[in-house]
Amino acid sequence: MNSPARVISFVNAAHFIDHYSMLIFAAAIIVMGPALGMAYSELLPYATPGFVAFGAGSLLTGWLGDRWSRRHMMVIFFVGIGASMIAVGLVQTPLQLGAALLSIGLFASIYHPVGTAMIVSYADKLGREMGLNGVWGNLGVASSALVTGVIGQYLGWRWAFIIPGIV
C-alpha cells in the first residue's frame, strides 16, 4: 500500500501542485483587475505575503515534518492548498484576497522541506527521482499560466482558482 513508487508519485504530484498554485494569481491578475475594479498595480501587493510565507514558512514546516509526521504534513498540504485556492475564488474584498493568497503560500511552504525529505527517504535511485521531481515542479510552473489563462478567459478568474482547488 505504501510502496516507494506510490509515495514518490504523490510527492511528484505535490511538487506540480505547489508551483502551479503559487503562480495562478500571476496569470489571473490580468482579468481580475477589471472584474474587481482595481488596477493591476493595486492588486500586485496582495501576492507578496503569500510569496514571503512560501519561503519563510518552510522553516516551520520542515521542523514540523521532522518532529511530527511527514505523511500527515503532506495530507495537510493537499487539503490546505486546495481549500486555499477555492477560498481565493470566493473572495469579495481585497483583504480577503490577501488572506487567501497568504494561505496558499503557507500551505505551499510545506512541500519543499517535507516532500524532498520524503523522496530522499523512499528513493532507490536518488538522482533519478530528484530529477523527475524537478521536472514535475517545472511542469507546474510551465502549465499554470496557460491553464489559468484558458480557464479565466472562458469561465472567469474565480474558476481559475476553484477548479484546481477542487482537483
For each predicted feature, which ranges?
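Conserved MFS/SLC helix-loop-helix module at the cytosolic interface between two early adjacent transmembrane helices
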Residues: 56-92
